[in-house]
Amino acid sequence: MTATHNHYLAVLGEDFVAQQYANEGYDITARNVSFSVGEIDIIATSPQGEVVFIEVKTRSSSLMDAAEAVTPTKMRKIHRAASKWLQGKPFADIRFDVVAVHVDEYGELDMTRYQGVEHGAC
């Protein structure tokens, strides 16, 4: 796979996940937030006011489950980025979700959501 194909899949997956969360009443606060310590794909606020940091992994093959790509090291980077993003903001409950998106050969997408993931390796 090429870098362009991988980027296309990533954007496709992130758009799909953001729309699914929005359909469930979440406010999509930010996307692709990057700090020197790490990046967050999607930041959303739940209907209950909880800030949710969402890592999206998209795959078009089943060689490796997308969620397995979220290692403890990756989660540490996400936690650090979340800490940076939260600086100076009002206190809120937070949650870390990992969403694995699969794109089949017909371009159909489905997702598996892991809510409240703290250390990776769903």
Swiss-Prot record:
Q: Which InterPro entries match?
A: Restrct_endonuc-II-like, tRNA_endonuc-like_dom_sf, UPF0102_YraN-like
Q: Which Pfam families match?
A: UPF0102 (PF02021)
State the superkingdom: Bacteria
Annotated GO MF terms: nucleic acid binding
Assigned protein family: Belongs to the UPF0102 family.
Q: What is this protein called?
A: UPF0102 protein DIP1513
